[in-house]
Structures are given as C-alpha cells and as structure tokens.
Amino acid sequence: EMTSSLVGSEMCIRDRSSTVDFVFSAVDMTKDEIKAIEEAYAKTETPVVSNNSAHRWTKDVPMVVPEINAAHFDLIKTQKERLGTTRGFIAVKPNCSIQSYTPALAAWKEFGPKEVVVTTYQAISGAGKTFKDWPEMIENIIPYIGGEEEKSEKEPLRVLGTLENGEIKLAEEPKITCQCLRVPVLNGHTAAVFI
C-alpha cells in the first residue's frame, strides 16, 4: 500500500492505530512533521519504532542498540508520563552508519579508549537513492556528506551513555572524530575504525 495514503489527518492516525500492534516509522518529511506524526501514533497507545532522526535527541526517547544499551528502554516510563499513555511510546535507532562500529566501541569500553578515528563509506541507499535516481554516483565518490560527521561523532556517545535520574548522561569518552564519504555502492555501509 502506498505510504502517501497512510499519512495525513489525525483521523487517519486513529483509524490506522486501531488496526496495528506497532508502527515502524521511516518517512521522508520534515523533522517537525515526523515528531508530530510519531507522537500522534504514540498518543493513540501505538508503540513507534523510528528510523528517523527527528527524536534522536528528545530527552525521554531512547536511542537504542539493544545489545549495548537495553537499559535505556527504562526512559520509556518517563516518556509515557509526558505523553499520558499506558502503552504508546517512541523508541529510535541511531544513524545507520554508526550501527556498524558502535558495538565494537562498546566491547572496548572497559579498556577506556580515549580517542576513536572513524571513516565511513556510505552506500547511496543511505541517501534514499538508487543508481537510476543518481547516475552521477556511478564510479564517483563524494568526500563529504553534510551533517553525517556530526551525527557519527555524537550519537555513539548517547548510545554508550548511562541512564541517570531519568535521562541519558552522554559518555565523556572516547573522543570520536569522523569523516563520512558517499561511495558508489547501492546498499551497505562500511566503517574503518581506529581505537
């Protein structure tokens, strides 16, 4: 079914939420629109698992890689109080490029790494493109992806952080420096990580 027919009025959200157990959210909208639609679903008692970046820094929304920070799910209690829900909530996943190396950082955490240098090689699917849509990428590399470096340096610190007093305290170390390149690969990101 076309997603455009699923997105729209508040009535549509109420109607759809009564027919589903939960919602996977991966939409191409502004951050404000995404926040509004995800909260609307949560307020209808429908759990939302989001691929979008809109709620990644909302204080009571857990950004989870379950193998690393399942304790962050406890934030959902605080979020439900804010939303006035018993079942509905929002949880997000981190940026796709950090999922490949954050588990390795977590494994090294006990050794106290001070600095991490990462270079990501990101497929065009990460930009929502195919080679048909973006023929200029065939045999081409883009050496800078706007906004990706900042996300790749900050989001792991939230994932590796600790839950304290109902919010996430960011990990203070390691210091992460990242360079993000777009490469002529359809699917799959790669990261070179130096700890």
Regions found by a protein language model. Give the residues of each.
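Single conserved hydrophobic/aromatic residue that forms the stacking wall/gate
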Residues: 2-13
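Conserved acidic residues
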Residues: 10, 21, 45-46, 88
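Rossmann-like NAD(P)-binding element
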Residues: 14-36
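Active-site-lining helix/loop region of Rossmann-like oxidoreductase modules
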Residues: 18, 85-87, 99-195
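Receiver (REC) domain switch-region micro-motif
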Residues: 23, 48, 193
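Short glycine-rich anion-binding loops that position phosphate/pyrophosphate groups of nucleotides
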Residues: 28-30, 54-55, 95-97
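Rossmann-fold NAD(P)-binding glycine/threonine-rich loop
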Residues: 32-85
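Catalytic helix-loop patch of NAD(P)-dependent Rossmann-fold dehydrogenases
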Residues: 65-111
